[in-house]
Amino acid sequence: MSAPQKTSALRTPFKTVALVGRYSTAGIEGPLEELASYILRNGQDVVFERETSLATGLTGYPALTAEEIGREADVAVVLGGDGTLLGIARQLAGHNVPLIGVNHGRLGFMTDIPLEDVQSVLPDMLGGRYEAETRLLLESSVVRDDSPIFSALALNDVVVNRSGISGMVELAVSVDGYFMYNQRSDGLIVSTATGSTAYALSAGGPILHPTLSGLVLVPIAPHSLSNRPIVLPQEAEVTIEVATARDASVNFDMQSLTSLLPGDRIVVRRSKKTIQLLHPVGYNYYATLRKKLHWHEYPTEDNRL
């Protein structure tokens, strides 16, 4: 399977735009309504994700479930942060509906368009002029007594960790059926390139460019300093067995979780489903890194020494 791709070309304009918002944010109704009106004036039809519509009271537009958006919309514009985009991305996985991330608050790695810039870049993007990136997803299942008890998708990461405040978890990690190591730690992160700038980064993992399709294993506060992050090929299957743990759980993009017992196995592999992120023409991933991570190598806005 080929690596995630980044492409830029003039394509067919979008006709129906779904709006998804971080509806728990106070005051988001105004920006959402303004964005919807602007898209209508630009010549596209607008629908709202149902929970966004109900929570904000913006009921003057068709309100669709994620499944219905997958069938009826051509593109989804997400107003919020990376967490909002993560949630809808998993729901739309497999529907071939690309996502445009508009940031409402701090700049995100995926919601990379500032709200104040949206009216200057959105017409071109909805008209078919944009840069597209395909991002891989992880699929994971929890196996107990040889029977799957839980499964979920993740765009960022699958995290096995201790839930309580005391004690470590002991994990036995295998890759493609080959035993790798036993690890005593606060947990283990299995991350995509997309997730390498999230929890994995704060745990000491490397940054992977989003067009890379490998996985990275990142221990969380390991007991042994020799347990280091390792990058694996895209087709690797990672199995994590809980050897001992007082109170452990597995999280998927830190948005859904299930509790674990000793003997449980968590199997993580690349999903056949992907998502597509759209950016304005001229999008610069390194500029996003510089702004988010405060890499102040250049003292001026025009990147000159």
Swiss-Prot record:
The keyword Transferase applies. NAD(+) binds at residues 82-83, 156-157, 184, 186, 197-202, 221, 255. It catalyses: NAD(+) + ATP = ADP + NADP(+) + H(+). Its EC number is 2.7.1.23. It is an enzyme of class 2 (transferase). Keywords: ATP-binding, Cytoplasm, Kinase, NAD, NADP, Nucleotide-binding, Transferase. It is found in: Cytoplasm. It comes from the Bacteria. The keyword Transcription does not apply. GO terms for biological process: NAD metabolic process; NADP biosynthetic process. GO terms for molecular function: ATP binding; metal ion binding; NAD binding; NAD+ kinase activity. Its cofactor is a divalent metal cation. One of its GO terms (cellular component) is cytoplasm. The active site is at 82 (proton acceptor). InterPro entries: ATP-NAD_kinase_N, ATP-NAD_kinase_PpnK-typ_C, NAD/diacylglycerol_kinase_sf, NADK. Belongs to the NAD kinase family. PANTHER family: NAD KINASE (PTHR20275:SF0). Involved in the regulation of the intracellular balance of NAD and NADP, and is a key enzyme in the biosynthesis of NADP. Catalyzes specifically the phosphorylation on 2'-hydroxyl of the adenosine moiety of NAD to yield NADP. This is NAD kinase. The gene is nadK.
